[in-house]
């Protein structure tokens, strides 16, 4: 059912900001990855809420493909919706928090997405 396990980390951008996930306290599973969307949840428990992240096109021009090639391979994932299981015994534990995904195909640097749909680069 779970195609591949990936670790996703939360980031606390500002100490006084809303509760965010810390990298050493929680991990997530990508339980379903499509072409333009991924479903993420905290465990393999089907009663847990999941979050759906959708991919947006990367920004930038393609005039100089060699110098900007890394820009075109970094997906922008934004929060789309929370998936609540239909069964009555649902365990709701995912909240609107900040997400941080490893940057694909690059060394260093990360691209963050917030639950409100904002994209941030680190």
Curated annotation (Swiss-Prot):
It comes from the Eukaryota. Belongs to the FAM223 family. This is Protein FAM223B. The gene is FAM223B.
């Amino acid at each position: 059912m779970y195609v591949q396990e990936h670790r996703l980390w939360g980031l606390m951008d500002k100490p006084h900001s809303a509760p965010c996930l810390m990298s050493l306290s929680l991990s997530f599973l990508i339980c379903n990855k499509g072409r333009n969307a991924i479903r993420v949840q905290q465990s393999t428990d089907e009663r847990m809420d999941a979050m759906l992240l959708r991919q947006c096109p990367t920004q930038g021009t393609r005039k100089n493909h060699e110098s900007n090639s890394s820009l075109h391979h970094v997906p922008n994932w934004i929060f789309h919706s929370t998936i609540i299981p239909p069964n009555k015994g649902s365990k709701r534990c995912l909240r609107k928090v900040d997400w941080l995904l490893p940057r694909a195909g690059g060394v260093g640097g990360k691209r963050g997405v917030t639950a409100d749909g904002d994209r941030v680069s680190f």
